[in-house]
Amino acid sequence: MALNLQDKQAIVAEVSEVAK
């Protein structure tokens, strides 16, 4: 599971734009 910080950052960026 080496996709924690990178994936989380990418998801947060997408969710941030969607939640705009």
UniProtKB/Swiss-Prot annotation:
It comes from the Bacteria. GO terms for cellular component: ribonucleoprotein complex; ribosome. The keyword RNA-binding applies. Signal peptide: none annotated. Keywords: Ribonucleoprotein, Ribosomal protein, RNA-binding, rRNA-binding. Belongs to the universal ribosomal protein uL10 family. Part of the ribosomal stalk of the 50S ribosomal subunit. The N-terminus interacts with L11 and the large rRNA to form the base of the stalk. The C-terminus forms an elongated spine to which L12 dimers bind in a sequential fashion forming a multimeric L10(L12)X complex. Forms part of the ribosomal stalk, playing a central role in the interaction of the ribosome with GTP-bound translation factors. This is Large ribosomal subunit protein uL10. It comes from Citrobacter freundii. The lineage of its organism: Bacteria, Pseudomonadati, Pseudomonadota, Gammaproteobacteria, Enterobacterales. The gene is rplJ.
